[in-house]
């Protein structure tokens, strides 16, 4: 009851995030379609080959950036989930833990999609930057999940 206003705000934020994640499904599909379309570009001449290659590279960069944003958003949601677990109804704390595990899975799944796209990019600086961010985001997400689960498991000990 003491944190009811905050929980109402968090519920609104969660609904907005749900809508964002649904929009990201479409963005990811569009990014894949764009890469696929680039592979269908003509490649009969050297100029066509160069244009096709450049288009594939740009489309693949975008295809890596879409799931990276999903991973960032899912990680931010983990902070919200932590607040809910700590301040919300104690009878629902295990639900918050399941939400945390799901958010961590969303982070890691999105990062796998980032990495598969990075593997075919020639822009090594771009690849290194996103790979470093992906590694850090994975570390942070796993640590945040562990922090909450350890905390709640300790509380639940009989």
Report each predicted region and the residues it spans.
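Conserved, well-structured ligand/cofactor-binding cores
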Residues: 1-158
